[in-house]
Regions:
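Non-DNA-binding regulatory cores of transcription-related proteins
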Residues: 67-146
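Basic amphipathic alpha-helical segments that dock to polyanions
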Residues: 29, 58-68
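Short capping segments at the starts of secondary-structure elements
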Residues: 32-37
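Short alpha-helical segments that sit at the start of domains
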Residues: 1-26
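A short acidic, leucine-rich amphipathic alpha-helix
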Residues: 40-46
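Short, contiguous, helix-prone interaction/anchoring segments in small proteins
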Residues: 29-31, 43
C-alpha cells in the first residue's frame, strides 16, 4: 500500500486534507528514512525541486502531520520521523517507543505494551512522579553499528 495514499485516506477519514505542500513534506520525510529537524527537512524539500518553502511553513505542516499521527517528534533531539504505521490498516493503541542509535542516528519505532507502560507509571507514582509525556525514547547502538 502506498504510504502517501494511506496518509491521504487517514486525513480524509479525519475530515482534513493532505494538501500538496503537506504531501511534499511527508514525502520528503518518508524518503529520507531518518530523523531530521524542521530546518533539515526544509532544505530537503527545497533541494528536491518542490516549490520553495520557508521553515515556518514546514513547522506548521509538521504540527498538522503530527496531529494526524503521520509523523512523530522526538523530544530528546527535536527531530521528526514519519510514522512507521501509516500504511497499516489496523489501529495502534500502544504507545510507540523509539530506539535511537548513538552512532548512525537511525531511529526504529517499536510498540510498547500497555503492561510495560503501566509498570513505568507505577514506578513513577511510587516516587511521587507524574508522567506528562508517555513517549519513550531510548538511545543505544543499532545492529548495523555493533
Amino acid at each position: 500500500v502506498d504510504v502517501i495514499s494511506s496518509a491521504e485516506q487517514k486525513c480524509a477519514d479525519n475530515g482534513v486534507k493532505l494538501t500538496k505542500r503537506r504531501k511534499q513534506v511527508l514525502t520528503a520525510l518518508v524518503e529520507c528514512n531518518a530523523a531530521v529537524s524542521a530546518y533539515e527537512l526544509t532544505e530537503l524539500c527545497n533541494q528536491q525541486g518542490y516549490t520553495a518553502m520557508p521553515a515556518m511553513s514546514v513547522y506548521r505542516i509538521l504540527d498538522f502531520l503530527e496531529g494526524q499521527s503521520l509523523v512523530h517528534r522526538l523530544s530528546t533531539t527535536n527531530k521528526y520521523i514519519a510514522c512507521s504505521h501509516i500504511s497499516c490498516q489496523h489501529s495502534h493503541f500502544r504507545r510507540p517507543q523509539f530506539l535511537i542509535c548513538n552512532d548512525c542516528t537511525r531511529v526504529q519505532e517499536v510498540d510498547v505494551t500497555s503492561e510495560t507502560l503501566s509498570a513505568i507509571e507505577r514506578v513513577a507514582a511510587d516516587v511521587g512522579f507524574n508522567l506528562s509525556d508517555k513517549q519513550l525514547e531510548v538511545s543505544g547502538t543499532c545492529s548495523d553499528c555493533k
